[in-house]
Amino acid sequence: MKAIIVLLMVVTSNADRICTGITSSNSPHVVKTATQGEVNVTGVIPLTTTPTKSHFANLKGTKTRGKLCPNCLNCTDLDVALARPMCIGTIPSAKASILHEVRPVTSRCFPIMHDRTKIRQLPNLLRGYENIRLSTHNVINAERAPGGPYRLGTSGSCPNVTSRSGFFATMAWAVPRDNKTATNPLTVEVPYICTKGEDQITVWGFHSDNKTQMKNLYGDSNPQKFTSSANGVTTHYVSQIGGFPNQTEDGGLPQSGRIVVDYMVQKPGKTGTIVYQRGVLLPQKVWCASGRSKVIKGSLPLIGEADCLHAKYGGLNKSKPYYTGEHAKAIGNCPIWVKTPLKLANGTKYRPPAKLLKER
């Protein structure tokens, strides 16, 4: 029995060649695994893409808002938010919005001291709502407000469809008719007038000028005090008399004075208050806003549709589940950002071509 076994081993060992391994071509695919590090495999499916910059687009299945009022020609978003004459129109509903003006400005109406308040934020505040509408009624009777009666001031730089002069529809420039004298602080209540449980955004402000103009308009050339309060937020201002900075953002408007504009957010059923002296810009029409719209920084125009809006790349279609490149805010059905490309191995672990053993 032992002799037979020895014979078999000899026969086997005298075979011409013995092959080890699996025959395979060279593999260019390398994947990094959790347990074995880098491994060559016979096939992979790429899971990542590196996007290129493109136009922004409407998110598929929904409307995306670019300009607040697309049909308001030659109007900035701040013009629309303040309801400048000729810039009043319908703001479309939208689930997503493009923040395309980094520093919103107004023009061709009245020089605004933008940096005294948070007024630049108003267009972006509105953009964050899905539904936005301007009230059809004024929130208070400005002509009969405390300290009046008032006439409502206008500017030749703000023509409207019926007159060569006008003013923002969201505010009334309260100029005393007869009683042009200094006044102690006066208080007006601002009721909630929206009808569908929306947030009410109430715009107000004040006008100031040089000493001569302040005396002529209001009978008082001293700095005036103003306070607004709503939803637990109180803001105080003191007006500046003369010495105003140049208003290059407003295109060199001719007025000697300046206005400071602010807003307050009133929740359903809540009353706001404004305490004021001379030169007040009393609230008139208010914004009624509801729902949420996702906001992303981008640019116009909006072209076509896309699965995803990306702050750096624009409109993206989700061809792969992951992407590499610049990481930035994105909204919609977006791929997930990863630092390095990901691959799914769909073949076997690569083994080099079979090696020949030495003949015995």
Swiss-Prot record:
In natural infection, inactive HA is matured into HA1 and HA2 outside the cell by one or more trypsin-like, arginine-specific endoprotease secreted by the bronchial epithelial cells. One identified protease that may be involved in this process is secreted in lungs by club cells. Palmitoylated. One of its GO terms (cellular component) is virion membrane. GO terms for biological process: fusion of virus membrane with host endosome membrane; fusion of virus membrane with host plasma membrane; symbiont entry into host cell; virion attachment to host cell. Keywords: Disulfide bond, Fusion of virus membrane with host endosomal membrane, Fusion of virus membrane with host membrane, Glycoprotein, Hemagglutinin, Host cell membrane, Host membrane, Host-virus interaction, Lipoprotein, Membrane, Palmitate, Signal, Transmembrane, Viral attachment to host cell, Viral envelope protein, Viral penetration into host cytoplasm, Virion, Virus entry into host cell. It is a single-pass type I membrane protein. The keyword Oxidoreductase does not apply. Gene3D superfamilies: 3.90.209.20, Hemagglutinin Chain A, Domain 2. Residues 1-15 form the signal peptide. Glycans are attached at residues 40, 74, 160, 179, 210, 246, 317, 346. It is found in: Virion membrane; Host apical cell membrane. One of its GO terms (molecular function) is host cell surface receptor binding. Binds to sialic acid-containing receptors on the cell surface, bringing about the attachment of the virus particle to the cell. Plays a major role in the determination of host range restriction and virulence. Class I viral fusion protein. Responsible for penetration of the virus into the cell cytoplasm by mediating the fusion of the membrane of the endocytosed virus particle with the endosomal membrane. Low pH in endosomes induce an irreversible conformational change in HA2, releasing the fusion hydrophobic peptide. Several trimers are required to form a competent fusion pore. Homotrimer of disulfide-linked HA1-HA2. Major glycoprotein, comprises over 80% of the envelope proteins present in virus particle. The extent of infection into host organism is determined by HA. Influenza viruses bud from the apical surface of polarized epithelial cells (e.g. bronchial epithelial cells) into lumen of lungs and are therefore usually pneumotropic. The reason is that HA is cleaved by tryptase clara which is restricted to lungs. However, HAs of H5 and H7 pantropic avian viruses subtypes can be cleaved by furin and subtilisin-type enzymes, allowing the virus to grow in other organs than lungs. This is Hemagglutinin. It comes from Influenza B virus (strain B/Texas/4/1990). The lineage of its organism: Viruses, Riboviria, Orthornavirae, Negarnaviricota, Polyploviricotina.
